[in-house]
From Swiss-Prot:
This is Glyceraldehyde-3-phosphate dehydrogenase. There is a cross-link at residue 186 (Glycyl lysine isopeptide (Lys-Gly) (interchain with G-Cter in SUMO2)). The gene is GAPDH. One of its GO terms (cellular component) is cytoplasm. A motif ([IL]-x-C-x-x-[DE] motif) lies at residues 245-250.
Amino acid sequence: MGKVKVGVNGFGRIGRLVTRAAFNSGKVDIVAINDPFIDLNYMVYMFQYDSTHGKFHGTVKAENGKLVINGNPITIFQERDPSKIKWGDAGAEYVVESTGVFTTMEKAGAHLQGGAKRVIISAPSADAPMFVMGVNHEKYDNSLKIISNASCTTNCLAPLAKVIHDNFGIVEGLMTTVHAITATQKTVDGPSGKLWRDGRGALQNIIPASTGAAKAVGKVIPELNGKLTGMAFRVPTANVSVVDLTCRLEKPAKYDDIKKVVKQASEGPLKGILGYTEHQVVSSDFNSDTHSSTFDAGAGIALNDHFVKLISWYDNEFGYSNRVVDLMAHMASKE
């Protein structure tokens, strides 16, 4: 089939950047957007200007009640109830569920009532099957109507863990992600439900937080189930995060051996997904980078032949958004 037609539910950070990634790559067509909290003129403004990734390099305007990007008209809906969005009328076959609210099969399934054929949840899901490009995307099949693209951190960790496990075997490992702030955090101290620390001022603190990212790797790489877990530190940077994977290896390996296999993977089967660098990089060097994960050869360290700390960078917004687009293109190739 030709390019798949896509609707986006929730025009937040990921919704807008999936839209940018779609136009940049040309792999899918965005035909509809739903957001009850943003009107059309505001959508134009929010899409055009971005404090993190800069101004959109193209044209964007409102015309005849539609959002027109690079001359392509996009139907706009403002429904709160996902079951009432007329995706079918707009020609949307797939829906990116990027509100962060409808992350279960049941809730995300509401989109199917409006004529969508498949739903891609741009967040981890409690019950939807999770797919990570380069890791288990080949396991996707046509019987699945609702899937999840997992989290940005799982997309960073899983490709690296796969390469290490395939070559040396991971006995067990702990992950820490030093993670940029996201929209769920507070600018100054405020109330935050059950997780009190999460309500502390994002600009003033390093905040320990939970993440299911490492455990989720066990869902996309079954052999690693129960072998990885981890946590996060939220730090006062706007974007770009870094994974620190400390793991025990089954087969002995020199650090140079590890560098070699990761570099090979980055130039071969995982090209465009897993990057490799020996440069003296810092986080801002990865702003707007499209890789899921970039291995930092110079930052890692080995204690001995069986125990290593591996470092990998990721643009938690844009790298992830590009994988959502890639996953949809992969699904479309299986129709």
